Amino acid sequence: MSILEKVQPIETMLPARYYTMSTEDMEKRVREIKEKMGKMLCIPCHHYQKDEVVQFSDAIGDSLQLAQVAARNKEAKYIVFCGVHFMAETADMLTTDEQVVILPDMRAGCSMADMADIEQTERAWRELTTLFGDTMIPLTYVNSTAAIKAFCGRNGGATVTSSNAKKMVSWAFTQKERLVFLPDQHLGRNTAYDLGIELNQMAVWNPNTDSLEYSGNLEDIKVILWKGHCSVHQNFTVKNIESLRKSHPNMNIIVHPECCYEVVQASDYAGSTKYIIDTIEQAPSSSKWAIGTEMNLVNRLIQKHSDKEIISLNPFMCPCLTMNRIDLPHLLWALESIERGEQVNVIQVDKQVTKDAVLALNRMLERV
């Protein structure tokens, strides 16, 4: 190898050769590397990932389950995370310094997580403190950046997932009189309402105008919701439900709580990704279901439960575009880079951010 070759930087974009490889060859190479590395390698996959990636997963789950997998895994030196950026950050923060977390495609982000940056959040906290004093505790959905998790950790708050949101919101109200919930207003609103908090006791913080939007009395506000949302679940509407009720009156409708309040109220069931999966699995044969969540998962449930009639609540839905960034070529590239000792797309969260964020994560993990 020449000196020039030695100093060339490691590639940061998928090399062209992976575009020309056959699916069979790529699958064969992934299996070879997995067999060779054994327990030194762990590939966790989120439920929204493509089947071409999920087939190689060592663990598949929702955000809570994958956080627990990362926290428990002490054997794997390399964790190749098939999800989006905030999930890989969480895995890095919950694993040891000796473990390496890799995201196959760094473009796999999350629009919801990007709706709350740390500067906006700190500014909002200062403004809200002038209104409410020391009566607030922050909770962040795990679909947030490491910096936002760290902010919550520093301020006595915690993280939540859609699986444990009720438990964590209930806990938060044992700590303070008011709750600031970010970045997903819909999960926060749906959870708070389920716990008996009225809509006029909730306000929305708009980070674009630095203003608090509310209809009731300011002193009665118990929940401040960040004005963020999931770009996928935002596409399920009450019109979808009304249309389905007319065309399929016997269809059960189940949605994720990232859908808006009106959609959740008009549905028959609402719950986390795990809740949706479990409900469909336990449903009687020949039952009929319209599901309001990400399309890769819906398609997987359709394939797995051929004895049931399953459709998407929105007939024009597409998969989560950022989740779909992770594909077989990127997975193989990540694995071959490990094999060569030239890891690409390593996720490393700042140590102080990690220290603060882990406070928030552990407050959640201790209660589930």
Curated annotation (Swiss-Prot):
Principal subcellular localisation of the protein: cytoplasm
Cofactor note: Binds 1 [4Fe-4S] cluster per subunit.
One GO-annotated biological process of the protein: 'de novo' NAD biosynthetic process from L-aspartate
Reactions performed catalytically: iminosuccinate + dihydroxyacetone phosphate = quinolinate + phosphate + 2 H2O + H(+)
Any one GO molecular function term: quinolinate synthetase A activity
Subcellular location: Cytoplasm
InterPro entries: NadA, NadA_sf, Quinolinate_synth_A_type3
Recorded superkingdom: Bacteria
Residues given in the record as iminosuccinate binding sites: 46, 63, 141-143, 162, 256-258, 273
Binding site for [4Fe-4S] cluster: 110, 230, 320
Cofactor(s) this protein requires: [4Fe-4S] cluster
Documented EC number(s): 2.5.1.72
Pathway membership: Cofactor biosynthesis; NAD(+) biosynthesis; quinolinate from iminoaspartate: step 1/1
Keywords: 4Fe-4S, Cytoplasm, Iron, Iron-sulfur, Metal-binding, Pyridine nucleotide biosynthesis, Transferase
GO cellular component assignments: cytosol
Transmembrane spans: none
Top-tier EC class: transferase
Summary of the function given for this chain in its UniProt record: Catalyzes the condensation of iminoaspartate with dihydroxyacetone phosphate to form quinolinate.
Similarity annotation: Belongs to the quinolinate synthase family. Type 3 subfamily.
Designated name of the protein: Quinolinate synthase
The organism of origin for this protein: Bacillus cytotoxicus (strain DSM 22905 / CIP 110041 / 391-98 / NVH 391-98)
Upper taxonomic lineage: Bacteria, Bacillati, Bacillota, Bacilli, Bacillales
